From Swiss-Prot:
Pfam families: PSII (PF00421)
Membrane-spanning residues: 69-93, 134-155, 178-200, 255-275, 291-312, 447-471
Organism: Spinacia oleracea (Spinach)
Name of the protein in its database record: Photosystem II CP43 reaction center protein
Biological classification of the source: Eukaryota, Viridiplantae, Streptophyta, Embryophyta, Tracheophyta
Subunit structure comment from the entry: PSII is composed of 1 copy each of membrane proteins PsbA, PsbB, PsbC, PsbD, PsbE, PsbF, PsbH, PsbI, PsbJ, PsbK, PsbL, PsbM, PsbT, PsbX, PsbY, PsbZ, Psb30/Ycf12, at least 3 peripheral proteins of the oxygen-evolving complex and a large number of cofactors. It forms dimeric complexes.
UniProt site (Susceptible to oxidation): W365
GO cellular-component term (any): photosystem II
Gene that this sequence comes from: psbC
Record PTM Phosphothreonine, positions in chain: T15
Length: 473
C-alpha cells in the first residue's frame, strides 16, 4: 500500500547535495527526494504529510493571531486605520466588529478576542502537527482507511475534493450568517457616511448574481469587481455556498467520468499544480477587488481607491473655489475643457481636469450629489454636506500610492501625507503571490505531465560540477 510504484522511476533527476544527511529516516534512498525537497519526501507517507499540513496550518493561524495582537497593541483610535499600516484590523472592522457610524472604532476588545482565539487555535494545530509528524502512524491507509488515500485512486481523490468544497461552502455561509443574524457587517453606503447594519434583503436573483460574471472586465463594466452593494455581495456568498456544498456532495457520491479520467493527470504533483493554478486565479482576482472595490473593502478602513483619491481632489478644489466665488458650472480650464465640470463620452456631467479618466468612480461621499445626468449642478451649489468635504479632503491626501521604501503619497503633492495605503499593500502582495503561484503551477504541471508520459527532461547530471565537490559535512 505504501509504495505502489517507485518514485525514483518518475524522478530520476534529483541529485543529493549531501548523501549522508537524513531527516527522521526519510532519506533520498527511500523516497527519491533529498532532505531539501521538503514535503516531497512525504508523498507516499500520508500520516507524515498530514502532520506537515496541520503544522503549516498552525503556523498560518499563529501568524494571524500574533499579528492581530500586534496591531491591537499599536492601534491609535484617533487616527484612521489606513494611516497606521494595519492589514488585519481593517478586515475585522469590515465584518462589523468594534466599529460604529462613519467607521469610527468604538471598541477594540473584539480585536483582542480575535487575536487570542487564533493563538489558542494555533497551539492546538501545532500540537496536532507535531504529533502526526513525529509520533503518529507513518501511513493512514492501514489504521484509518477513511483518511488514507492513494494518489492514483481517482474515486478517493474526488471524494477528498468534495469534502474540501463542502468546507468552502460552509465558510461562505459563515459570512452570510454574520451579515444576517450576528450583528451585521459594515456598510460604507449607509446614509450619512457608513455604519454597521444587518443585511435584510439579500439579492438572490440569478440574473443579477450571474450577470456580474458576464460583464466586460473593462471600463464602467468591471466584471464582478464592480459589485457595489452589500445585498449583492451577501447574495453572491449564498449562491457560492450552495454551489460549493452541492458540488461537494456530487463529487463525494460520483466517480470521475471517462473524459475526465483521460484528460487529467492523476498524481500528487498534478493535484499540486491544479491547486496552485486555482490559488493564482484567486490572487489576481483579489488584487483587482482590493484595488478598485470600495464596498467589499471600505475606504474608511483601507484608504481610498486610486480613482477615489483623484476624484476627491477635484471635489475638494471645486468646493474651495466655489466658496471663493468661482462659477464651477462654466469655468474653463487650460485645455479649453471645463475646469471643474465637463461631460463624459456618454453625456454625463463629470469632474473636469486630469481626473476625467476616473469619471466612472462610484463612492458613498459623492453619489448623493449625482442626478439623472451625472453630477447635479444645483446640488453641488446647495447640498454639499460637511462630512462629504471632510472625507474628500482626507482621501485626497491619502492616495494609494507608494514605493518600495515605504515613502507613500503623491511625490509632487504638497498636501500629501507620508504613508503607504494598505490597499497598495494588499493589491501588490496578491498580484505578486498570484504571479509566483502561476509560475509554480507551470513548473509542477510540466513535471507531472512528463512523469505521467514516462519521461522527464532534466539537466544531464553526469558532468555536474557539484559531483566533484567535497561533501558539505
Amino acid at each position: 500500500m505504501k509504495t505502489l510504484y517507485s518514485l525514483r522511476r518518475f524522478y530520476p533527476v534529483e541529485t543529493l547535495f549531501n548523501g549522508t544527511l537524513t531527516l527522521a529516516g526519510r532519506d533520498q534512498e527511500t523516497t527519491g527526494f533529498a532532505w531539501w525537497a521538503g514535503n516531497a519526501r512525504l508523498i507516499n507517507l500520508s500520516g507524515k504529510l498530514l502532520g506537515a499540513h496541520v503544522a503549516h496550518a498552525g503556523l498560518i493561524v499563529f501568524w494571524a493571531g500574533a499579528m492581530n495582537l500586534f496591531e491591537v497593541a499599536h492601534f491609535v483610535p484617533e487616527k484612521p486605520m489606513y494611516e497606521q499600516g494595519l492589514i488585519l484590523l481593517p478586515h475585522l472592522a469590515t465584518l462589523g466588529w468594534g466599529v460604529g457610524p462613519g467607521g469610527e472604532v468604538i471598541d477594540t476588545f473584539p480585536y483582542f478576542v480575535s487575536g487570542v482565539l487564533h493563538l489558542i487555535s494555533s497551539a492546538v494545530l501545532g500540537f496536532g502537527g507535531i504529533y502526526h509528524a513525529l509520533l503518529g502512524p507513518e501511513t493512514l491507509e492501514e489504521s484509518f482507511p477513511f483518511f488514507g488515500y492513494v494518489w492514483k485512486d481517482r474515486n478517493k481523490m474526488t471524494t477528498i475534493l468534495g469534502i474540501h468544497l463542502i468546507l468552502l461552502g460552509i465558510g461562505a455561509f459563515l459570512l452570510v450568517f454574520k451579515a444576517l443574524y450576528f450583528g451585521g457587517v459594515y456598510d460604507t453606503w449607509a446614509p450619512g457616511g457608513g455604519d454597521v447594519r444587518k443585511i435584510t434583503n439579500v439579492t438572490l436573483s440569478p440574473s443579477i448574481i450571474f450577470g456580474c460574471l458576464l460583464k466586460s472586465p473593462f471600463g464602467g463594466e468591471g466584471w464582478i469587481v464592480s459589485v457595489d452593494d452589500l445585498e449583492d455581495i451577501i447574495g453572491g456568498h449564498v449562491w457560492i455556498g450552495v454551489i460549493c456544498i452541492l458540488g461537494g456532495i456530487w463529487h463525494i457520491l460520483t466517480k470521475p467520468f471517462a473524459w475526465a479520467r483521460r484528460a487529467l493527470v492523476w498524481s500528487g504533483e498534478a493535484y499540486l499544480s491544479y491547486s496552485l493554478a486555482a490559488l493564482s486565479v484567486f490572487g489576481f482576482i483579489a488584487c483587482c477587488f482590493v484595488w478598485f472595490n470600495n464596498t467589499a473593502y471600505p475606504s474608511e478602513f483601507y484608504g481610498p481607491t486610486g480613482p477615489e483619491a483623484s476624484q476627491a481632489q477635484a471635489f475638494t478644489f471645486l468646493v474651495r473655489d466655489q466658496r471663493l466665488g468661482a462659477n464651477v458650472g462654466s469655468a474653463q480650464g487650460p485645455t479649453g475643457l471645463g475646469k471643474y465640470l465637463m461631460r463624459s463620452p456618454t453625456g454625463e456631467v463629470i469632474f473636469g481636469g486630469e481626473t476625467m479618466r476616473f469619471w466612472d468612480l462610484r463612492a458613498p461621499w459623492l453619489e448623493p450629489l449625482r442626478g439623472p445626468n451625472g453630477l447635479d449642478l444645483s446640488r453641488l451649489k446647495k447640498d454639499i454636506q460637511p462630512w462629504q468635504e471632510r472625507r474628500s479632503a482626507e482621501y485626497m491626501t491619502h492616495a494609494p500610492l507608494g514605493s518600495l521604501n515605504s515613502v507613500g503619497g503623491v511625490a509632487t503633492e504638497i498636501n500629501a501625507v507620508n504613508y503607504v495605503s494598505p490597499r497598495s499593500w494588499l493589491s501588490t502582495s496578491h498580484f505578486v503571490l498570484g504571479f509566483f503561484l502561476f509560475v509554480g503551477h507551470l513548473w509542477h504541471a510540466g513535471r507531472a505531465r512528463a512523469a505521467a508520459a514516462g519521461f522527464e527532461k532534466g539537466i544531464d547530471r553526469d558532468f555536474e560540477p557539484v559531483l566533484s565537490m567535497t561533501p558539505l559535512n
